[in-house]
UniProtKB/Swiss-Prot annotation:
Location of Phosphoserine modifications: 74
Organism of derivation: Arabidopsis thaliana (Mouse-ear cress)
Annotated Low complexity bias: 30-46
Protein name in UniProt: Dormancy-associated protein homolog 4
Higher taxonomy: Eukaryota, Viridiplantae, Streptophyta, Embryophyta, Tracheophyta
Signal peptide: none
Length: 123
């Protein structure tokens, strides 16, 4: 029993038991609360999630860029300390356009973030 006394941590488990582990506090709070038996109704909720795999436009993600001419973006809008480069949002913060690249967009030219997002969507 000496080994168990050394491992006992009062900050986690509370005060040590008087004799043996059978004297530990037992919480009866859960046994006093009784719930009614589940009723058989037509309004049942399913607990499943179905993820459909569609035509994910991977290259379309790379074509999004911030609109630099947004009227709300100015140096007078302070950024938060945690995200100093947070973009300012107008009604349409993203505009579709091509990002200049040296070659064809393919899977090897994806950023790490895009690769993680695409792989998470494919699961």
């Amino acid at each position: 029993m000496g080994f168990l006394h050394k491992l006992w941590d009062e900050t986690v488990a509370g005060p040590t038991p008087d004799n043996g582990l059978g004297k530990l506090r037992k919480h009866d709070s859960l046994s006093t609360v009784r719930s009614s038996p589940p009723s058989l109704s037509s309004d049942q909720v399913t607990r499943s999630i179905m993820v459909t795999k569609g035509n994910n436009n991977v290259r379309g993600l790379r074509k999004l860029k911030m609109d630099p001419d947004s009227p709300t973006c100015s140096s007078s809008n302070p950024g938060t300390p945690l995200t100093p480069g947070t973009p300012c949002y107008a009604l349409g913060p993203f505009t579709a356009g091509k990002i200049p690249s040296s070659g064809e967009d393919d899977a090897a030219s994806l950023t790490t973030y895009e690769w993680i997002v695409i792989n998470a969507l494919d699961r």
